């Protein structure tokens, strides 16, 4: 894949994740078990994506100014970046489990935890808009 395709795929992945978070936040406000299960299934598909190919060397905001918000720190701290990604996937698994159990309280708590993992990564590895 060329650089443009990689950047488009990376952006599409994170946009789909953001859209999923927004939808689940809506579901959590007035918990609907069936809607939660449907959103959890969508989240599960998103989180099954192998994101490693979306972060090839040479695709940071330093390399491609104005084309991406991915900081160069990702590539100099790949182990930490990977750990943050794993934390997101683990929190996502908690959201999915709570949704499938129909547990509104656990769903809300897991969703907050998932949002926290997004913020933790953005704080270190995403350029400010």
UniProtKB/Swiss-Prot annotation:
<protein>
    <recommendedName>
        <fullName>Cytochrome c'</fullName>
    </recommendedName>
</protein>
<feature type="binding site">
    <location>
        <position position="68"/>
    </location>
    <ligand>
        <name>heme c</name>
    </ligand>
</feature>
<feature type="binding site" description="covalent">
    <location>
        <position position="121"/>
    </location>
    <ligand>
        <name>heme c</name>
    </ligand>
</feature>
<feature type="binding site">
    <location>
        <position position="10"/>
    </location>
    <ligand>
        <name>heme c</name>
    </ligand>
</feature>
<feature type="binding site">
    <location>
        <position position="15"/>
    </location>
    <ligand>
        <name>heme c</name>
    </ligand>
</feature>
<comment type="function">
    <text>Cytochrome c' is the most widely occurring bacterial c-type cytochrome. Cytochromes c' are high-spin proteins and the heme has no sixth ligand. Their exact function is not known.</text>
</comment>
<dbReference type="GO" id="GO:0020037">
    <property type="term" value="F:heme binding"/>
</dbReference>
<dbReference type="InterPro" id="IPR012127">
    <property type="entry name" value="Cyt_c_prime"/>
</dbReference>
<keyword id="KW-0349">Heme</keyword>
<keyword id="KW-0408">Iron</keyword>
<dbReference type="Pfam" id="PF01322">
    <property type="entry name" value="Cytochrom_C_2"/>
</dbReference>
<dbReference type="GO" id="GO:0005506">
    <property type="term" value="F:iron ion binding"/>
</dbReference>
<feature type="binding site" description="axial binding residue">
    <location>
        <position position="122"/>
    </location>
    <ligand>
        <name>heme c</name>
    </ligand>
</feature>
<dbReference type="InterPro" id="IPR015984">
    <property type="entry name" value="Cyt_c_prime_subgr"/>
</dbReference>
<feature type="binding site" description="covalent">
    <location>
        <position position="118"/>
    </location>
    <ligand>
        <name>heme c</name>
    </ligand>
</feature>
<feature type="binding site">
    <location>
        <position position="69"/>
    </location>
    <ligand>
        <name>heme c</name>
    </ligand>
</feature>
<dbReference type="InterPro" id="IPR002321">
    <property type="entry name" value="Cyt_c_II"/>
</dbReference>
<dbReference type="GO" id="GO:0042597">
    <property type="term" value="C:periplasmic space"/>
</dbReference>
<dbReference type="GO" id="GO:0022900">
    <property type="term" value="P:electron transport chain"/>
</dbReference>
<keyword id="KW-0249">Electron transport</keyword>
<keyword id="KW-0479">Metal-binding</keyword>
<keyword id="KW-0813">Transport</keyword>
<dbReference type="GO" id="GO:0009055">
    <property type="term" value="F:electron transfer activity"/>
</dbReference>
<dbReference type="InterPro" id="IPR010980">
    <property type="entry name" value="Cyt_c/b562"/>
</dbReference>
């Amino acid at each position: 894949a060329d650089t443009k395709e990689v950047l488009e795929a990376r952006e599409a992945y994170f946009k789909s994740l953001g859209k999923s978070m927004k939808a689940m936040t809506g579901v959590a406000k007035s918990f609907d078990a069936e809607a939660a299960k449907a959103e959890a299934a969508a989240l599960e598909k998103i989180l099954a994506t192998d994101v490693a190919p979306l972060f090839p060397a040479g695709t940071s905001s330093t390399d491609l100014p104005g084309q991406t918000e991915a900081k160069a720190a990702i590539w100099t701290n790949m182990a930490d970046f990977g750990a943050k990604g794993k934390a997101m996937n683990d929190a996502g698994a908690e959201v999915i489990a709570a949704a499938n159990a129909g547990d509104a309280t656990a769903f809300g708590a897991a969703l907050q935890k998932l949002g926290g993992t997004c913020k933790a990564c953005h704080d270190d590895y995403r350029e400010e808009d």
